[in-house]
Amino acid sequence: MQFFVLSHNLQIHSESVPSFTPSELAEGLSLHSDHINTNALNHPHWMVLVESDLSHQELAREVVNAWKKFRNSLGHSMNHSFIALGGRKDSKATPGSPLQEGYWGVDVVECANPDSFLKSINWDALKASRPVDGVFEVRD
C-alpha cells in the first residue's frame, strides 16, 4: 500500500484555473480514478491523503491523470503543465503531521513552464540529496 500526502503548488494566476479546497480536491480525484482512495486533510500545507495499491511511480501518474480529468470536467483551462514531485519520508514524523515515515510527500505543480519552475526550486540539487528510490518526478 502506498500513501501520498498531497500539496498543491498553483503557479497559474488565472480565473480559468482556480485553486481547490482540500475537500473539493479529495472528492474530484476520487471521482476520476478507480485506483485511489482519498481523504481531505486539515493542515496548512498538506491537502489530501491518497492511498493505493499501485507502485509509487504508477500512483504518481494516476494522481496527475485524475487531477487533469478533474480540471477538465469542471471546464477549467488546460493549456498548462502538471508536475508531481515526490519525496519519501525516511525519518520520524513530526507529531501531528499527516506525512508519516514511509509516506510520500507529493507536491502537484500546475505551471506554464516546467523547466523554469524546476530550475527555480533547484530541483536537480534536491533530487541529488535523496536516495534514487526515494524521489520522483512525473510531468504531463
Curated annotation (Swiss-Prot):
Pfam families reported in the protein's UniProt record: DUF2656 (PF10847)
Gene Ontology, cellular component aspect: phycobilisome
Keywords annotated in UniProt: Antenna complex, Phycobilisome
InterPro entries: Uncharacterised_16.1kDa
Superkingdom of origin organism: Bacteria
UniProt protein name: Uncharacterized 16.1 kDa protein in cpeY 3'region
UniProt organism field: Synechococcus sp. (strain WH8020)
